[in-house]
């Protein structure tokens, strides 16, 4: 059983669509193994997204991710990483397939509603960033 990390970003939390997004995960075979709502600090956002530190959008990404609360979850299921990415849709909501989370709830390429791990290896690292093993069940 695979696990992946999902973050419901500040734009989606502010719009009040957290429940609708969680329903997408659960109705497509992904179980929530852990979840918490939190306010990312600038330091934590920089550390979490440090892989993008050299990219031009890094500062805006950190600013956006600290602009309001997020909901961080461990999703579990068969092919969880791929399934989550399919449910999310393309990074740019204008390119996201109809019926995906980003097509339905995202505002822009920056305020794109959700983050999801892009590989099993990254999922393990990202999950460990937010959750202790005892919090995942």
From Swiss-Prot:
Which cofactor does the UniProt annotation name?
Mg(2+)
Arranged from A to Z, the UniProt key words for this protein are: ATP-binding, Cytoplasm, Kinase, Magnesium, Metal-binding, Nucleotide metabolism, Nucleotide-binding, Phosphoprotein, Transferase
Provide an example Pfam family for this protein.
NDK
- Localization: Cytoplasm
Origin superkingdom: Bacteria
GO biological process per UniProt: CTP biosynthetic process; GTP biosynthetic process; UTP biosynthetic process
The UniProt catalytic activity note for this protein reads: a 2'-deoxyribonucleoside 5'-diphosphate + ATP = a 2'-deoxyribonucleoside 5'-triphosphate + ADP; a ribonucleoside 5'-diphosphate + ATP = a ribonucleoside 5'-triphosphate + ADP
The enzyme class is: transferase
Tell me which NCBIfam families the record gives: PRK00668.1
Q: What do we know about how this protein assembles, alone or with others?
A: Homotetramer.
**Family per UniProt?**
Belongs to the NDK family.
Recorded protein name is: Nucleoside diphosphate kinase
Q: Which gene encodes it?
A: ndk
């Amino acid at each position: 059983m695979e696990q992946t990390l999902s973050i419901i970003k500040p734009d989606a939390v502010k719009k009040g669509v957290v429940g609708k997004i969680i329903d997408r995960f659960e109705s497509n075979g992904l179980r929530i193994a852990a979840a918490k709502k939190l306010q990312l600090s600038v330091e934590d956002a920089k550390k979490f997204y440090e892989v993008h530190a050299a990219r031009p959008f890094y500062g805006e990404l950190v600013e956006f991710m600290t602009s309001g609360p997020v909901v961080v979850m461990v999703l579990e299921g068969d092919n969880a990483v791929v399934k989550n990415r399919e449910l999310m849709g393309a990074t740019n909501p204008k390119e996201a397939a109809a019926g995906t989370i980003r097509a339905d709830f995202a505002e822009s390429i920056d305020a794109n509603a959700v983050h999801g791990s892009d590989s099993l290896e990254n999922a393990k690292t990202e999950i460990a960033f937010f959750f202790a093993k005892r919090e995942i069940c």
